[in-house]
Amino acid sequence: MFQIELDEEPVAPKVLEFFKNLPENATAEQSLETFQKTFSFLHENVLEKYTSDLFTPSTLKEELDEQLAQAENNAQSQLSELLKNTKRFVLNYDNDRPEDLEAPEYFTQLVDGVLDKKEDLEANISKYLTKTWSFSRLTLVEQAILQVSSYEILYTETPDVVAVNEAVELSKDFSDEKSSRFINGVLTNFLK
């Protein structure tokens, strides 16, 4: 067996010397100065690398802000791609093969409008749900139908009755009879 003694290594005593020479409550500048004096024997390139690695100020907030900005950019590009694919799917719903169709202006206005006003629409719809039901508890189909119809009622010139009837018909096609009655009730109260 053999034993490694750190005292034989040239760096270990220098680390101890650094900590001994470091003033109590030293500022970053004092720490850097002490480090450079203690490790002056190192080659200039090595000293520069250790100095920049150890004494470059970096805050957690800056690192998190950078990562958050990158994540938001990624999410935005993924959302744009998802929206594009969703529009293509909806436009080709009845087609045997997907075609490159142009979205009607009103369809684009509805989709973009619902996305822009999502929080307001959810808050308005939630006012007309019972205390035991939250908006997030609704099925995704019910959420989408209620958002589109409430957007039509609040922000377009579509007659309110037409918006409600379209919502009820959509819920019959994509959900069940119980859901269509529920949507009719929520939207009827929404109009009052």
Swiss-Prot record:
Keyword list, A-Z: RNA-binding, Transcription, Transcription antitermination, Transcription regulation
A single GO BP: DNA-templated transcription termination
Pfam families in the record: NusB
InterPro entries: NusB-like_sf (IPR035926), NusB_fam (IPR011605), NusB_RsmB_TIM44 (IPR006027)
Gene Ontology molecular function, alphabetical: RNA binding
UniProt keyword annotation of Transcription present: yes
Gene3D superfamilies: NusB-like
Assigned GO CC terms: cytosol
NCBIfam families from the UniProt entry: nusB
Similarity field: Belongs to the NusB family.
Function field: Involved in transcription antitermination. Required for transcription of ribosomal RNA (rRNA) genes. Binds specifically to the boxA antiterminator sequence of the ribosomal RNA (rrn) operons.
Protein name per UniProt: Transcription antitermination protein NusB
Gene transcribed to yield this protein: nusB
